Amino acid sequence: CGTNRAWCRNAKDHCCCGYSCVKPIWASKPEDDGYCWKKFGGC
């Protein structure tokens, strides 16, 4: 699964537990890649 800065296609891509798929500001299209980033809180 993806940890910090692992690429993810969208929110459905599998980021590790405790991580979420975040898109940069310039990634406006749905097909644009985002990256997994650690969320606050436990898992």
Curated annotation (Swiss-Prot):
Disulfide cysteine pairs (residue numbers): C1-C16, C8-C21, C15-C36, C17-C43
Transmembrane segment boundaries: none
Record keyword S-adenosyl-L-methionine present: no
Tissue: Expressed by the venom gland.
A Gene Ontology term for the protein's cellular component: extracellular region
GO molecular function, one term: toxin activity
Free-text description of this protein's post-translational modifications in UniProt: Contains 4 disulfide bonds.
Keyword Oxidoreductase among record annotations: no
Keywords of this entry: Disulfide bond, Knottin, Neurotoxin, Secreted, Toxin
Compartment annotation: Secreted
Comment block on domains: The presence of a 'disulfide through disulfide knot' structurally defines this protein as a knottin.
Family: Belongs to the neurotoxin 35 family.
Function noted in UniProt: This toxin blocks the neuromuscular transmission, and also acts on muscle. It exerts an effect of first exciting and then inhibiting the contraction of muscle. This toxin is active only against mammals.
Protein name, entry field: U5-hexatoxin-Mr1a
Organism name: Macrothele raveni (Funnel-web spider)
